[in-house]
Amino acid sequence: MHFLSEDLEDYVAAHSQAEPELLAQLNKETYQKVLLPRMLSGHFQGRVLSMLSKLIRPSSILEIGTYTGYATLCLCEGMQENGIVHTIDIKEELVDFQRKYFDKSPWSNQITQHLGDALEIIPTLNKKYDLVFIDADKENYINYFEMIVPKMNKGGIILSDNVLWSGKVLEPLQKNDLSTKILLEYNQLLNNDPRVETVLLPIRDGLTVSRVL
């Protein structure tokens, strides 16, 4: 869900940095060939991710939920020259699609793809991170956060996507709606956890920026 009108979204995009050509191609092919293309970050949120990365200047990035690799490439734009990205996704059918676009980018040799369950993969990554982007199964957001915090460098940034969940965070909770229940708990955790300071941005479907203290 987007919380701005279509006209306002168009205005915002028109007055933000243009979408790079490679990402425009990736965007188009995702909508043509991949299921659930609305999961793609898209032009405006992609530019936000790029800007945040450029402000942070990370040398190490972890992404949980690659999808077709759009956000991955946005985050790479601010990465230090010798930086690395580890990106995790569970969908085998997307691996070649991701790699095709990674190989067209300047960061082909700096992006490591991991296929499988992030809860199993994260503990095997012996690395400290400057920037983490969580955009995977909502039921595990809290589990991901708890795994990630000890792996963060001081001052590192954790980005969490879809935290407004199409506005469901304000609606009466349905009995079997585990995703919304966990997101409500997650948003509360980020707001109260003394290990981080957090701001929730109403960008697209909600994007939280948490700085590790």
Task: Please give the residue ranges for each predicted region.
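Beta-strand-loop-alpha "switch" segments that mediate conformational coupling across diverse proteins
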Residues: 26
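Short, contiguous, well-ordered secondary-structure segments
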Residues: 35-36, 59
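Short N-terminal amphipathic alpha-helix/helix-capping patch enriched in small hydrophobics
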Residues: 8, 22, 45-48
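N-terminal auxiliary segments of SAM/dcSAM-dependent transferases
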Residues: 1-20, 34-35
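Generic alpha-helical segment signature
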Residues: 19-23, 179
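S-adenosylmethionine/decaboxylated-SAM
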Residues: 43-213
